[in-house]
């Protein structure tokens, strides 16, 4: 099966109008392409929950802080289409920039508070770019449900808050992080890792797991954080952006796992920024 690739908003709306008139529900999986099994798990979740599924592929320039980062982002549309054909996806929406940000576009969607920490603190404007493009994709697709991975947990929370605050009639569904056999969280950026860096990358997850186990046993976070930072440096990671314990509900900083919490980490390895987060058991 060949998946229809829609390039224009008019083509997209023609399809979604027909589906809604037939009483069918629509699920959307927003991506920037370079699809891996993590993305495909979102597609599978959408297929099980909705009558029709749209996968969007759009490398959003507004969420990149560096032009070089945007230029180097993997683009593999033909391979992506082959992968999606196996899932009987109803449409791929792959617009060019003019369909998302037409000439004169001057609106910015910003979610205050939770975008000032973690990745937001190190990538100024990143989540404004995310919130803006996702708002556009939600309104353009008229989807009933949207599927995001917990691997980008902060992004998931930002999108859920944005949809709630703006009364967008869509359910934002979070899906579990999918990992490689060695524990590395699947990410399109993993394609940028050298062979040597790829063998080093899983150490971040191992360090996080060790800290999470100790937190669940009641250990205070400050000593664990200091140890983790030393371990990451020893493992070859540079410029650790953060290694923090935060509330699942509000992203507020915690010093003990006294409430539902997650560990968040971001660090650079051989020029590639890797991020991860894991659930932490409430301390006994």
From Swiss-Prot:
Any one GO CC term of the record: cytosol
Annotated binding of (R)-pantoate, by residue: 63, 155
Entry-linked HAMAP family: PanC
Keywords, ordered alphabetically: ATP-binding, Cytoplasm, Ligase, Nucleotide-binding, Pantothenate biosynthesis
Top-rank lineage group of the source organism: Bacteria
Record text on subunit structure and interactions: Homodimer.
Family: Belongs to the pantothenate synthetase family.
Binding-site list for beta-alanine: 63
Name of this protein: Pantothenate synthetase
InterPro entries: Cyt_trans-like (IPR004821), Pantoate_ligase (IPR003721), Pantoate_ligase_C (IPR042176), Rossmann-like_a/b/a_fold (IPR014729)
Class in the EC hierarchy, top level: ligase
EC number, UniProt record: 6.3.2.1
Reaction equation(s) it catalyzes: (R)-pantoate + beta-alanine + ATP = (R)-pantothenate + AMP + diphosphate + H(+)
Note: The reaction proceeds by a bi uni uni bi ping pong mechanism.
Main location: cytoplasm
GO annotation, biological process: pantothenate biosynthetic process
Active site (UniProt): 39 (proton donor)
Keyword Acetylation appears in the UniProt entry: no
């Amino acid at each position: 099966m060949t998946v229809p690739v829609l390039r224009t908003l008019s083509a997209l709306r023609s399809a979604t109008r027909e589906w809604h008139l037939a009483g069918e529900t629509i699920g959307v999986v927003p991506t920037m392409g370079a699809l891996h099994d993590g993305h495909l798990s979102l597609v599978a979740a959408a297929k099980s929950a909705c009558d029709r599924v749209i996968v969007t592929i759009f490398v959003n320039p507004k969420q990149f802080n560096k032009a070089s980062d945007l230029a180097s982002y993997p683009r593999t549309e033909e391979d992506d289409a082959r992968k999606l054909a196996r899932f009987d996806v109803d449409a791929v929406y792959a617009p060019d920039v003019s369909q998302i940000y037409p000439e004169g576009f001057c609106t910015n969607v910003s979610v205050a508070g939770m975008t000032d920490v973690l990745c937001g603190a190190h990538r100024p404007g990143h989540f404004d770019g995310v919130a803006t493009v996702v708002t556009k994709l939600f309104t353009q697709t008229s989807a009933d449900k949207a599927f995001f991975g917990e691997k980008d947990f902060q992004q998931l929370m930002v999108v859920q808050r944005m949809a709630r605050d703006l009364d967008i009639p869509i359910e934002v569904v979070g899906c579990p992080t999918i990992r490689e056999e060695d524990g590395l969280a699947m990410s399109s950026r993993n394609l940028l890792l050298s062979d040597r860096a790829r063998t080093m990358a899983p150490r971040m997850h191992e360090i996080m797991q060790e800290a999470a186990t100790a937190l669940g046993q009641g250990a205070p976070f400050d000593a664990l954080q200091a140890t983790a930072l030393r371990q990451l440096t020893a493992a070859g990671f540079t410029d650790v952006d953060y290694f923090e314990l935060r509330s699942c509900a509000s992203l507020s900083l915690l010093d003990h796992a006294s409430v539902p919490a997650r560990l968040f980490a971001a660090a650079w390895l051989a020029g590639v920024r890797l991020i991860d987060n894991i659930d932490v058991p409430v301390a006994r």
